Amino acid sequence: MLVVNVWGSWCAPCRVEAAALEQAATDLTDEGVQFVGIVIRDSLTSAQQFQEEQGVTYPSIFDPDSSTLLQVPSSLYPVATPTTYVVDHEGRVAVRILDKTTAPTLTGLVEDVLAEREAA
């Protein structure tokens, strides 16, 4: 399972949610959940500084011109920053959050998706 967060260092809600995402990533490690960020409309220096200051340890893809995001189907294209996706084991987007999130909310949603897989 994969959690993808679209963010930018210039984004105030991204700054608010950074610690929550890091906490969720830590809490879900034993479940085999991977986290990755996609940095948009940002400089590499600002993005790296943001990750260091916010204590973000999961990797991020540097996408200043949004070319990576252009690969996302238009129905799922992020219309807000931050946007967080939970991608299930079959590669389907199971959850899309169009605002900042909290660790309990994100962890709960991921656990729900994991439970659906186990029930199947």
Which residue ranges define each predicted feature?
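Short active-site neighborhood of thiol/selenol oxidoreductases, capturing the structured segment around
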Residues: 1-15, 21
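Structural microenvironment flanking redox-active thiols in thiol-disulfide oxidoreductases
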Residues: 15-54, 65-71
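Thiol/disulfide oxidoreductase modules built on the thioredoxin-like
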Residues: 52-56, 64-115
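Non-globular targeting/processing and membrane-anchoring segments
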Residues: 117-120
